[in-house]
Design a protein with these regions (language model features):
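N-terminal beta-strand-loop-alpha-helix module at the start
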Residues: 20-90
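C-terminal catalytic domain of photolyase/cryptochrome flavoproteins
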Residues: 38, 204-205, 211, 230-468
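Conserved short loop/turn motifs at secondary-structure junctions
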Residues: 67, 94-100, 119-123, 362-368
Length: 468
């Protein structure tokens, strides 16, 4: 019997040793693709067992500026990535928790040979997480292969545009043709309520994932973007020609370089064909991509001290409580200003709104209603499917008047309404209560005579609010 016990112990020890498989971890973050992925290529070059890891972080999803719509878009993007990995013989390994704790458990249970990832480092929390992972890897002696990306590799004092375009022209990294099978178990897919995210009702939200991103890109480059970025377009026309790629770029379902190269190729073909209108539109689009990347880089150099990621409010506006009627009216699209209310209702239902209208909403809350900027910025962030903390708060601080780069943006909502929605199509779509009003009264219904209002069954203050 003692001999049998000893044999059993030896077999268990051998099993444990064999289970220490020395994993090469590819840690996916906001780069949910297998194409043009430097960290994945680095992990593949290391050979051996490869674990495509994604960690759901409670600390992130429990923030005041995240939401169910963002979570669901991320899960859809991850599911598409999982399908791409399975086509190559592997699959996603899902975990939930604090990143360094998850890595520590994996190392204790299986052994980690190397860790490969793209750094973020654009907000204090992201920079701190990157630092903690580096410290942990150094402490336990694990080789780290950190890929910084364009926004960190270019000095703010360099010729940024030239360097960015040089990076964009580099050949894209090919996706691996095959991957070894996942050698460790994955946790199940979490749901939004696991992180305390409440249902926020976004019936017309776009669907995440690389498959949808590529379809959207092809639509845009094959004719959908013919008028993209053109001056003096109405809101409805802008919506019809928008690329709708921002959320996909945020999650990294497609790389910025992949989109830029596809747009440049299409632009060159259009120039050859003599289609200057469309070629010019794609030029504007690539310039917008550059501006987006520059904003990401700028965010890494902005001093963000508030927990909301906004600089301290130099105007000392009082932060609104959730019960504040002004905040409630603004959040629910009931300010009495039709363009503002239509914009908010559109964002509520779709998760998408062009940037100038987002700025209009935030400016009205903080500069007209004089609400403290933190809560309005958080509410607006929750509604945006393409929310990326670093870029969002850099832009928000400029709109609100907290940036040294520019004064606050304070547009007149009625004047904006007349110029951006002259035929009232956008307002009528989202505010059916006043859809029957003639164009001359639609943008400022409080100026309409009572006879015009009553003729269409409108009672200001009841069927539609008086302006705040």
């Amino acid at each position: 019997m003692p001999q049998l016990i000893e044999i059993y112990r030896l077999s268990q020890s051998l099993f444990y040793i064999c289970s220490m498989t020395e994993l090469n971890i590819i840690w996916f973050r906001r780069d949910l693709r297998v194409h043009d992925h430097a960290a994945l290529a680095s992990a593949c070059a290391a050979g051996g067992q490869i674990v495509p890891l994604f960690i759901f972080e409670p600390n992130y999803w429990q923030r005041a500026d995240t939401s169910e719509r963002q979570f669901e878009f991320a899960v859809e993007s991850l599911a598409d990535l999982d399908r791409a990995l399975r086509q190559r013989g592997s699959q996603l390994c899902l975990r939930s928790g604090v990143v360094t704790e998850v890595l520590s458990r994996l190392h204790a249970q299986h052994g980690i040979a190397s860790l490969h990832f793209h750094s973020l480092g654009n907000t204090p929390a992201e920079a701190e997480q990157d630092r903690q992972v580096r410290t942990w890897a150094l402490k336990v002696g694990i080789p780290l292969r950190e890929h910084t990306g364009i926004q960190h590799s270019i000095s703010p004092h360099s010729d940024w545009d030239t360097a960015w375009r040089r990076h964009m022209r580099k050949p894209r990294i090919a996706a691996p043709a095959a991957l070894p099978p996942l050698s460790i178990p994955s946790e199940g897919w979490p749901i939004a309520s696991d992180f305390g995210l409440e249902s926020d009702g976004c019936p017309d939200r776009q669907t995440g994932g690389r498959t949808n991103a590529i379809l959207q890109l092809r639509w845009f480059l094959s004719g959908g973007g013919r008028n993209a970025g053109k001056a003096n377009l109405s809101i409805t026309a802008c919506e019809a020609t928008a690329s709708r790629l921002s959320a996909h770029l945020t999650m990294g379902s497609v790389s910025e370089r992949e989109v830029w190269q596809a747009a440049m190729k299409a632009q060159a073909a259009l120039v050859t064909d003599g289609d200057e209108t469309f070629a010019t539109a794609l030029h504007r689009f690539t310039e917008k991509l550059a501006k987006r990347s520059r904003r990401v880089q700028a965010s890494a150099r902005v001093s963000l001290t508030d927990t909301s990621l906004l600089p301290v409010d130099i105007h000392n506006r009082e932060e609104a409580s959730l019960a504040d009627p002004r905040l409630s009216a603004w959040t629910n699209g009931k300010t009495g200003f039709p363009l503002l209310d239509a914009s908010m209702r559109c964002l509520q239902a779709t998760g998408h709104l062009e940037s100038s209208l987002r700025s209009l909403l935030l400016s009205f809350a903080t500069c007209h209603l004089w609400l403290g900027p933190v809560r309005p910025a958080q509410v607006l962030a929750q509604l945006c499917t393409d929310f990326a903390p670093a870029m969002y708060y850099v832009s928000a601080s400029q709109v609100i008047g907290l940036s040294k780069a520019a004064p606050a943006y304070i547009p007149n909502p009625v004047r904006q309404s007349l110029s951006r929605d002259p035929d009232g199509a956008f307002i009528r779509k989202w505010i059916p209560e006043i859809a029957e009003l003639p164009d001359q009264y639609l943008h400022a219904p409080w100026e309409a005579p009572k006879s015009a209002l009553s003729a269409h069954g409108i009672i200001l203050g009841q069927s539609y609010p008086m302006p705040l």
